[in-house]
UniProtKB/Swiss-Prot annotation:
Protein name according to UniProt: Large ribosomal subunit protein uL30
The keyword Disulfide bond belongs to this UniProt entry's keyword annotation: no
Keyword Ribonucleoprotein found: yes
Source organism of this protein record: Yarrowia lipolytica (strain CLIB 122 / E 150) (Yeast)
Annotated family: Belongs to the universal ribosomal protein uL30 family.
Single biological process term from Gene Ontology: maturation of LSU-rRNA from tricistronic rRNA transcript (SSU-rRNA, 5.8S rRNA, LSU-rRNA)
Signal peptide: none
Source superkingdom: Eukaryota
GO MF terms, alphabetically ordered: RNA binding; structural constituent of ribosome
Keywords for this protein: Ribonucleoprotein, Ribosomal protein
UniProt cross-references to InterPro entries, sorted A to Z: Ribo_uL30_ferredoxin-like_sf (IPR036919), Ribosomal_uL30 (IPR039699), Ribosomal_uL30_CS (IPR018038), Ribosomal_uL30_euk (IPR005998), Ribosomal_uL30_euk_arc (IPR035808), Ribosomal_uL30_ferredoxin-like (IPR016082), Ribosomal_uL30_N_euk (IPR012988)
Length: 250
């Protein structure tokens, strides 16, 4: 534009438009930076909560273990027998297929979500579930998992059910999205809820996709697989010995 010429309307609007675009871009960038900083602070705070809960659970587990030892020693000193509380949790593994299976046990296996051989699920022991386990006892192995078994299963083989999809538990956010309303926001919360059979056990166990285990190291042995555990076979209740089987299949 020549010197001394009065600027036209278009000459004025062009730089104003550019300034507005720059201002909008600056505002968007500032908003993104603020949101990122807020998210980082929130995540740091959540990490503190998760760490604190994990510490609390460790303390709780250790105190429970020490109490068991104390009660056993006390019973021994008094010349009596220590009778532990009835187990509330079992881990159930399907070990046989559908060949020659009657409709009723087949339906129960579906109800327990044991759709395939080597599928495993956590089950709360009630009068009703005990009856279901009795019906399908010739097709399953089950028992009382310890804390180590629960933790190893969830960390190594754990998948969540999200929108009917099998999703790896690679991020605590997946757990929080599904179970946060029950106060379960991380892996250790999930493990604690399962192991202690907490108030949200049903929701937690249903969130976990049935575990897909391997054949036990060394195999089942054809004859052993079709006999009850107390007869030297593989089916039925093996109580605490389920932990050795979990280790062999995990």
């Amino acid at each position: 534009m020549p010197a001394g010429t009065v600027p036209t309307k278009d000459d004025v609007l062009v730089p104003e438009t550019l300034l507005k675009k720059r201002k909008n871009a600056d505002q968007i960038r500032a908003a993104k930076e603020a949101a990122a900083a807020e998210k980082k602070a929130a995540n740091a705070e959540k990490d503190k909560v998760i760490f604190s809960r994990a510490e609390k659970y460790v303390k709780e587990y250790r105190e429970a273990e020490r109490e068991q030892i104390r009660l056993r020693r006390e019973a021994k000193l008094n010349g009596t027998f220590y009778v532990p509380a009835e187990p509330k949790l079992v881990f159930v593994i399907r070990i046989k297929g559908i060949s020659k299976m009657a409709p009723k046990p087949r339906k129960v296996l579906q109800l327990l979500r044991l759709h395939q051989i080597n599928n495993g699920v956590f089950v709360r022991i009630t009068k009703a579930t005990a009856e279901l386990l009795r019906i399908v006892e010739p097709y399953i192995a089950f028992g009382y998992p310890n804390l180590a078994s629960v933790r190893q299963l969830v960390y190594k083989r754990g998948y969540g059910k999200v929108n009917k999809q099998r999703i790896p538990l690679s991020d605590n956010a997946i757990i929080e999205e599904a179970l946060g309303k029950y106060g379960i926001i991380c892996m250790e919360d999930l493990i604690h809820e399962i192991y202690t059979v907490g108030p949200a056990f049903k929701q937690a166990s249903n969130f976990l996709w049935p575990f897909k285990l391997s054949n036990p190291s060394g195999g089942w042995g054809v004859r052993r697989k079709f006999k009850h555990y107390i007869e030297g076979g593989s089916t039925g209740n093996r109580e605490e010995n389920i932990n050795a089987l979990i280790k062999a299949q995990n």
